[in-house]
From Swiss-Prot:
Protein name: UvrABC system protein C
InterPro entries, per the entry: GIY-YIG_endonuc, GIY-YIG_endonuc_sf, GIY-YIG_UvrC_Cho, RuvA_2-like, UVR_dom, UVR_dom_sf, UvrABC_protein_C, UvrC
UVR domain mapped to chain residues: 203-238
Gene transcribed to yield this protein: uvrC
Domain of life, source organism: Bacteria
Disulfide bonds: none
Function: The UvrABC repair system catalyzes the recognition and processing of DNA lesions. UvrC both incises the 5' and 3' sides of the lesion. The N-terminal half is responsible for the 3' incision and the C-terminal half is responsible for the 5' incision.
Matching Gene3D superfamilies: GIY-YIG endonuclease (3.40.1440.10), UVR domain (4.10.860.10), UvrC, RNAse H endonuclease domain (3.30.420.340)
Matching PANTHER family: UVRABC SYSTEM PROTEIN C, UVRC/OXIDOREDUCTASE
Organism: Campylobacter jejuni (strain RM1221)
Extent of the signal sequence: none
Compartments, record wording: Cytoplasm
Pfam families: GIY-YIG, UVR, UvrC_RNaseH, UvrC_RNaseH_dom
Length: 600
């Protein structure tokens, strides 16, 4: 009967472009794809005789997915390009089981110069600056701030955005005071050109910094010399060692993919003025039952790296190999940036060699990662708790409050083998009980899935009730996220937390688990829970201190602790109390107290 329903749904497919979605019997999203012709594309997944089943001509991954499929949905679009953009958005937001999700939602910094200014200076941005005479350099995947500091250390350029008289940088010979007309614009621009040349040629900057470090050491200014030494080390780390001579002073980008032993590696080179100025690599472990899709990866990689709100410095993108939607991506990027963008596969010459180099480095990154990390704990968690995903990206949640005061929530993130502190999040909460607080935190996180892709696993500090709550929110979001909860053992109806040795219980959608205190899986989950708890407690303590300080100000006005608590209970925070209408305050705490608040 179920397959009959699916067969009827197949008959409704139009001959237009669009996005299709496959669901299993539990209503979970299995796969998102795009099509130039929905009817032809979707029907190619199936064989219709004697009964509806997976087309044996497709890959094993696709056949397995189709055997699980009981329902499909589609969205028709005006063009295949629109369908591709929508497909990418769905994959990022919903993380379907059989799609590979690249988790790189970061925006990387650019160094730029605004030549509209009389005396231009270097600045950092992560977005497009809406001015006509901007020159960008980057993106820099690491060390942008240190590189900027190194430029300002050696080249005496203006550092402050606005300055009417010589500042401290002039006094220490780090600026030539253009604000006071102590240098002409022509001479200043000559120094700026030298600095730009050094930015594009790190070896030049290194030589200059090494000279400066030597002078500082000879003058026994060892502290400053040590700072320069550290900057030299950072710039050496930034350099991409390439034995390829790029004859022309071109700007272009290079992408390559490698896949080995269920690990995907992506690599990107940024080339400006014929020099590789930065490189970025990413490692993504893939479940054994998913075959990697080269076309799918290139689409995600290029669309995510060339979003509308960043500067596009190169008109040409070189890729290591051909992929199905290359021409379609050219069309999308050309429309997005209102100029011709080409995606090419070089066959010979220096461009071919640099693409080969990118691929070789992507392979080396896989070997390096597998030497350092074998993903054992992730594989054990997936097998033992029967998870859908290999839990490489884990978000862990905890709340903290003191009798309904300073209510906060916290989320920490663990990726592959380390904490990703750039993804930690703090939440000020309105509710006072643990259940409603966790609902508030998880709902706010789920609403952000379109901006920050969902993880593989949520780990909740709590029991079955909070596990069921998390399931409700994930089902509502439509995302593919596994859920575990960890609760402290209860003795005499009291929960006990003994760091590292507590007999915690693990709750999954499959049941409840009591593991030995020596079990590596339990110890790993405890480590995750303890970090979330530490982060939540720290945020709670800081919030409480701030609230106590503000509370003491109201107390100094002569308001009793009871009145202050009444105000907080009603308005939620001190800012709202001070902004409250006088009449409302009078109704709540009386005219005398209201006057004290508004007068101060």
């Amino acid at each position: 009967m179920i397959k009959e329903n699916l067969e009827n749904e197949l008959k409704t497919l139009p001959n237009s472009a669009g996005v299709y979605q496959y669901f299993n019997q539990e209503g979970k999203l299995l796969y998102v794809g795009k099509a130039k012709n929905l009817k032809n594309r979707v029907k190619s997944y199936f064989a219709f005789t004697p009964n509806l089943h997976a087309n044996p001509r497709n890959s094993l991954r696709i056949q397995k997915m189709i055997e699980e499929t009981v329902h499909l949905e589609f969205i028709a679009t005006n063009s295949e390009a629109d369908a591709l953009i929508l497909e990418n958005s769905f994959i990022k937001q919903l993380h379907p089981k059989y799609n590979i999700l690249l988790r790189d939602d970061k925006t990387y910094p650019y160094i730029y110069v605004d030549f509209e200014e009389e005396f231009p200076r270097f600045e950092i941005t992560r977005k497009l600056v809406k001015k006509s005479k901007i020159k960008y350099f980057g993106p820099f995947f690491k060390g942008a701030r240190e590189l900027l500091d190194a430029l300002y250390l050696y080249y005496p350029l203006k550092q402050k955005a606005s300055c009417k008289s010589p500042c401290i940088f002039y006094q220490i010979s780090r600026c030539l005071a253009p604000c006071d007309k102590l240098i002409s614009r022509e001479k200043y621009l000559e120094i700026l050109d030298e600095a730009i040349h050094a930015l594009l040629n790190p070896s030049v900057l290194l030589k200059n910094l090494e000279k400066q470090m030597l002078v500082l050491a000879q003058n026994e200014n060892y502290e400053e010399a040590a700072k320069v030494r550290d900057q030299i080390a950072m710039i050496k780390d930034l350099e991409v060692k390439v034995e390829i001579d790029i004859a022309k002073l071109e700007d272009f980008e290079v992408f390559a993919l490698a896949f080995k032993n269920s690990v995907l590696s992506t690599l990107r080179f940024v080339v400006q003025n014929g020099k590789i100025i930065s490189a970025n690599s990413k490692i993504t472990p893939i479940r054994n039952d998913i075959q990697w899709d080269q076309n799918e990866i290139y689409k995600q990689l290029i669309l995510e790296n060339f979003s509308m709100d960043i500067p596009l410095l190169a008109n040409v993108i070189y890729v290591y190999e051909e992929f199905e939607d290359r021409v379609l991506l050219e069309e999308i990027l050309s429309q997005r940036f209102d100029k011709k963008i080409s995606i090419k596969i070089p066959k010979i010459g220096e461009k071919r060699r640099i693409c080969d180099l990118a691929f070789q480095n992507a392979l080396l990154n896989i070997e390096k990662e597998q030497k350092n990390h074998d993903f054992t704990i992730q594989k054990e968690l997936k097998f033992y708790f029967e998870l859908e995903n290999l839990p490489n990206d884990i978000e862990i949640f905890d709340n903290s409050h003191l009798q309904g005061v300073a209510n906060v929530g916290a989320m920490v993130t663990y990726r592959i083998n380390s904490w990703d502190k750039s993804k930690y999040r703090k939440f000020h909460l309105k509710h006072k009980n643990d259940y409603d607080q966790m609902r508030e935190v998880l709902t706010r996180r789920a609403l952000d899935f379109d901006k920050i892709p969902p993880p593989d696993l949520w780990l909740i500090d709590g029991g079955k009730a909070l596990l069921d709550l998390a399931k409700e929110i994930i089902v509502s979001s439509g995302a593919n996220v596994d859920i575990l909860a960890i609760s402290k053992e209860k003795i005499d109806a009291k929960a006990h937390r003994a760091k590292g040795g507590a007999k915690d219980k693990i709750h999954s959608l499959k049941g409840e688990f009591s593991l030995s205190i020596n079990d590596k899986k339990l110890q790993f989950l405890q480590k995750l829970r303890d970090e979330a708890h530490r982060f939540a407690i720290s945020f709670h303590q800081n919030t409480k201190k701030k609230q106590d300080l503000k509370s003491s100000k109201l107390a100094n006005l002569g308001l009793s602790s009871g009145v202050i608590q009444k105000l907080l209970a009603y308005y939620g925070n001190f800012e709202s109390i001070y902004k409250a209408d006088f009449k409302d305050l009078t109704m709540l705490v009386g005219r005398k107290a209201a006057q004290k608040i508004k007068e101060n």
